[in-house]
Structure formats: C-alpha cells, structure tokens
C-alpha cells in the first residue's frame, strides 16, 4: 500500500500511500507494463533475517533467536548478511547453489561490506567498484557502476547467468537536517531501477533475461492486508505484459522461480514448497523499448524543517541498515509525509488459512 496502492486493478488502500506514482514512476511503469503483484509477502521480519531469507530461503535458529535482542537494543549484533558465520545458512546461499551446479554468478553489493565479500563463496565473484550499502551514495551512481561492469562483461560474452544487484536507498534517513528527504531517497532508488530496465532492455541478452525485484523485509510498514505484504516486480523478455496476478507469492517462491530457470534444486523446505511465479511468464519473448522516467520530485531536496520528527530522526543510526526500531522509524516517515493530524495506523497482522475440502462419506 505504501508504494502501489494507487495502481489500477490492484488490491490497494490509497489512504496508506506514501510513495505513489509521482515519486516512483518507474516502478509503477514496471508493474503496469509487465506484472502487477499485489499479493506478495516477504518471509522475513527485518533486514537481519531478511537478507538470509532473500538469498537462502531461510534464516537459521541462531539468527532468528538473536535479532530480536539486537533490534530492541538489549545486546547482540546484527548477525545477518554473513556478518557472523554462526548466523549463516547451513548449506549456504543461492550463490553456493550456483557454485555446486557450475552456474556462473556475480554480486553487486549484496553480502559485500567495505570492499570485501562477507561469505567465502563470493570471493572473486563480486564487483569491487560497486558500492555496498550506504546512504551517502546515490543508487543512480550504483547503477552507473553496474552498467560499466555489465557492459565490459557483455563485450566479452561473459555475463554470469545469475546476478544480484543491490539498490538500497529506499530505506531513507527520515527527516535528519541536511540529508535527502524521504521522497528524494525513494525517487533516486526508483530512477536507478528504471535506468537498469532501460539498459537491459536495449541489450542483446534481453530475451534471455528475467529480473526479480524485491525488498528483503517490509520494514513493518502500514498495509491494509498484512505488514509483510511488500512491493515486488518481475520483468524480462518472457515476462507477460499488462498482467495482474493476485496469486499469493513469497520471498521463497521468488527464489524457487530463479532456481527453476537456472536448473537448480531447492535449498530448503521453504523454497521447495513455495509457489513459483508460473503465471508471470509467457511462451514467447517480446522486445521492450523503455526510457527511464525522471521523477518529477527533486532528487537533491534536503530536509530543512526542525520539528518533533526531525529530533527523533537525529537520534537514529543510519550507518547500517535496520539499526533502528522499525516501528519508531515507520512512525517518523508516516508523520513526516502525512502530517501530525493523521494517526499512524496500527500494523496489520493477518492469518491466511486455506480450508481443506471434506470428502463425502460413502
């Protein structure tokens, strides 16, 4: 709802919209031109377990038991994304799956910190020029670094079969004085995604490409269905056009779809049992011409207002993702955009039950 509630045909509540079409025109164009997924849910709660879910289809027992103490400020560390070996998935991540199957792979910023891979399987398999997470660097700059590396590999016919690219500035920095506004951060992130689509669509490997875009976690944002519901996108030569898919999908289902395309086995019981995005694909490829849409919002706009939400933002740590209480941060973003008079909505927790059909007795 925070991003796509204004999409025609989707299950959205526009009263919860924060970053609509005027801020995220490229993501809206992707959802409109390809597939609108309005029933996608992340499997994770926060970034600490979210990146492990996104790359490995589960977070282990240690990580699931320790992130709550870390996030509540009661001790412990982040742990995820390879930060602590004990928190890594037992059989590794999707890159390990690729390695075992002889599938080429490369990472741009994911599980990379300070110019170093955080898991051994990514040594010599990541772009050293691509900046890892940090809100001082724009996502459009990250796109340019990816573009340069991609073009050099394409010229040598060495583009890996599996790639992960991280654009993370839609985390935003709240309303800290002198820093980009939430709108500016999200618009920058959206433009990077649009530029990525534009460049890939013009490349000779478009028909062989399938791109899946997801958030590692939903940041406990307001949603009228469930706080785990999250924006997700898929585009590529074989992806359907102008299609709305209400099928319930998940992080693990998206991973399973990638595995099926690459001929990989599932990594865990979760991706093995998840629903792949079958309905999103067509039988034949279709060319696509796209020009990235420059958001109407000023990408350079800075926070200038001194108020309660600015004071709360100044107390937060944005040096590392999810270093703050997600509910507190969600409240800051809500009131910074909606104003003080509209109450912050209570996070929605839904239960999804599929009743088994009873067979008639003879």
Listing of model-derived features with the role each one plays in the protein:
Residues 1-362:
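N-terminal pro-sequences and low-complexity stem/linker regions of secreted or lumenal proteins
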């Amino acid at each position: 709802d925070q991003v796509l509630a204004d999409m025609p045909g989707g299950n959205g509540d526009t009263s919860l919209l924060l970053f609509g079409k005027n801020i995220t025109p490229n993501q809206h164009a992707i959802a409109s031109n390809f597939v609108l997924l309005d029933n996608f849910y992340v499997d994770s709660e926060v970034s600490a377990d979210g990146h492990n879910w996104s790359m490995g289809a589960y977070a282990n027992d240690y990580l699931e038991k320790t992130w709550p103490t870390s996030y509540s400020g009661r001790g412990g560390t982040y742990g995820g994304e390879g930060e602590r070996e004990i928190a890594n998935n037992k059989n590794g991540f999707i890159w390990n799956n690729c390695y075992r199957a002889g599938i080429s792979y490369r990472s741009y910023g994911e599980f990379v910190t300070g110019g170093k891979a955080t898991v051994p399987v990514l040594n010599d398999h990541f772009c050293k020029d691509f900046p890892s997470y940090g809100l001082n660097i724009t996502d459009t700059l990250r796109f340019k670094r990816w573009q340069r590396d991609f073009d050099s590999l394409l010229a040598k016919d060495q583009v890996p079969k599996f790639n992960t690219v991280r654009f993370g500035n839609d985390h935003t920095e709240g309303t800290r004085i002198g820093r980009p506004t939430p709108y500016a951060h999200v618009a920058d992130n959206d433009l990077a995604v649009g530029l990525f689509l534009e460049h890939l669509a013009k490349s000779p490997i478009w028909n062989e490409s399938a791109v899946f875009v997801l958030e590692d976690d939903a940041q406990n944002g307001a949603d009228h269905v469930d706080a785990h519901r999250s924006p997700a996108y898929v585009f590529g030569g074989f992806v359907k056009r102008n299609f709305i898919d209400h099928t319930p999908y998940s992080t693990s289902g998206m991973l399973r779809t990638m595995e099926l395309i690459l001929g990989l086995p599932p990594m865990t019981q979760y991706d093995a049992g998840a629903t792949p995005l079958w309905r999103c694909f067509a039988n034949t490829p279709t060319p696509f011409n796209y020009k990235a849409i420059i958001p109407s919002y000023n990408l350079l706009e800075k926070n200038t207002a001194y108020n309660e939400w600015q004071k709360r933002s100044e107390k937060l740590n944005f040096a590392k993702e999810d270093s703050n209480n997600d509910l507190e941060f969600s409240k800051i973003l809500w009131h910074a955009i909606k104003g003080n008079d509209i109450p912050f909505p209570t996070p929605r927790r839904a239960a999804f039950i599929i009743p088994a059909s009873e067979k008639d007795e003879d």
